[in-house]
C-alpha cells in the first residue's frame, strides 16, 4: 500500500491521539484546520478512552483500537502486554488499510505506537508531534521511522522541528501583556487553575497563604478546583475566614481566554498544554509541577518558561502557606508584566497552522 496522492481523490488525514486532553485537544485543532481545507479526517483511538467521548462530538469518525498503557498497572496487565500489543497491531493494520490515508499524524498517547508502526509498514507518511518537554516512549521509538518529527518544546526529540503546541485561537488573539497590565491598579489578580480533577495541594495551601496577608493588600483570587473538589475548596476558604470578595471558588471556567486575560498571575500545574497556554496568553505564572508525572516531565515543562524569566517554579514539597504568602507579597504588577511579556515571546501561536501545513507537505512528498 502507498498513500493516495491523486488529485481526483479527496485527501485523508488519519489522526492518532488519545488518553488525555493534552494529546486530544491539540490534535483536534489540527484536524479542524485540515477539515476546513477539504480534507477527510479519520481518528484512530480507543473508544473506551477520553477520545471516545470527545472526538465524535467534534464530528470526526473514530476507528477504535484496544490498547492502553502499562505504567502503574498490575502484573496481569504487564504479563498480557505482548498479546495486547499484537492485537493492537492487527487492528491498526486493518484501520490503515481501510482508510488509506494520504498522511498520518501522531499526537501522542499509547495508541500512537501500534497505529504509527502499521502506518509506516504500509507506506503512509507519518508526521509525529511531541507535546511534552520529555518525549514518551512511543514517540521516542516512532521518531526513528517518522517522515517528520515536531515538538512543542525545543530539544524534546533529536532533530525535531520546534513548532509549539496547537492551542485555541482565542488565546493567541488576546491583547499584548503590555496593553493589559498597563491599565491596572489595586490588588493583584490571581487565577488558580487546578484542572478538571483539581489540585489538592493548591486547594490546601492557597487559602491558608491568603489568610496570612493583610486584607487591604490581599490579592483578588479566582480559584478553579474541579467539580469533585469544589466543596472542599470552599470549606478551606471559609475555615480561614476568606469570603467571596477576595476569593471566588468555581468548579469550571468556560472562557479560559478571558480568565487568563484578567489575571496578573496564574498559579497552576505545568502540563504541556497549560504551559503553552500561559505563553500564548502572555501571563505571568507560578508553576507547581505535579510531582508524580511520568519522568517528572512537568518540572521540565515549567523550566522552559522559568529559565527565561517568564515564570516562577515551586516544587510541591517546597510549597507552603508562609512561603507562598511571602512570594505573593513580594511580587509587583510591574514584575509580573515583565514576566508576562517574556512568556508571550516564547509562544508559537501559529503551531496548529504549521502542523497542518507539514501534514499537507508530507502527503505530497
Swiss-Prot record:
EC number: 2.4.1.227
Biological process terms in GO annotation: carbohydrate metabolic process; cell division; cell wall organization; lipid glycosylation; peptidoglycan biosynthetic process; regulation of cell shape
Organism: Ralstonia nicotianae (strain ATCC BAA-1114 / GMI1000)
GO molecular function: UDP-N-acetyl-D-glucosamine:N-acetylmuramoyl-L-alanyl-D-glutamyl-meso-2,6-diaminopimelyl-D-alanyl-D-alanine-diphosphoundecaprenol 4-beta-N-acetylglucosaminlytransferase activity; undecaprenyldiphospho-muramoylpentapeptide beta-N-acetylglucosaminyltransferase activity
Keyword Glycosyltransferase: yes
Function: Cell wall formation. Catalyzes the transfer of a GlcNAc subunit on undecaprenyl-pyrophosphoryl-MurNAc-pentapeptide (lipid intermediate I) to form undecaprenyl-pyrophosphoryl-MurNAc-(pentapeptide)GlcNAc (lipid intermediate II).
PANTHER family given in the database record: GLYCOSYLTRANSFERASE, UDP-N-ACETYLGLUCOSAMINE--N-ACETYLMURAMYL-(PENTAPEPTIDE) PYROPHOSPHORYL-UNDECAPRENOL N-ACETYLGLUCOSAMINE TRANSFERASE 1
Record's keyword terms, sorted: Cell cycle, Cell division, Cell inner membrane, Cell membrane, Cell shape, Cell wall biogenesis/degradation, Glycosyltransferase, Membrane, Peptidoglycan synthesis, Transferase
Substrates-to-products reaction catalysed: di-trans,octa-cis-undecaprenyl diphospho-N-acetyl-alpha-D-muramoyl-L-alanyl-D-glutamyl-meso-2,6-diaminopimeloyl-D-alanyl-D-alanine + UDP-N-acetyl-alpha-D-glucosamine = di-trans,octa-cis-undecaprenyl diphospho-[N-acetyl-alpha-D-glucosaminyl-(1->4)]-N-acetyl-alpha-D-muramoyl-L-alanyl-D-glutamyl-meso-2,6-diaminopimeloyl-D-alanyl-D-alanine + UDP + H(+)
Listed CDD domains: GT28_MurG (cd03785)
Topology in the lipid bilayer: Peripheral membrane protein
A single cellular component GO annotation: plasma membrane
Protein name according to UniProt: UDP-N-acetylglucosamine--N-acetylmuramyl-(pentapeptide) pyrophosphoryl-undecaprenol N-acetylglucosamine transferase
InterPro entries recorded: GlcNAc_MurG, Glyco_trans_28_C, GlycoTrans_28_N
Compartments it resides in: Cell inner membrane
Family of the protein in this entry: Belongs to the glycosyltransferase 28 family. MurG subfamily.
Residues holding UDP-N-acetyl-alpha-D-glucosamine: 20-22, 132, 168, 196, 253, 298
Main localisation: membrane
Metabolic or biological pathway, per its Swiss-Prot or TrEMBL entry: Cell wall biogenesis; peptidoglycan biosynthesis
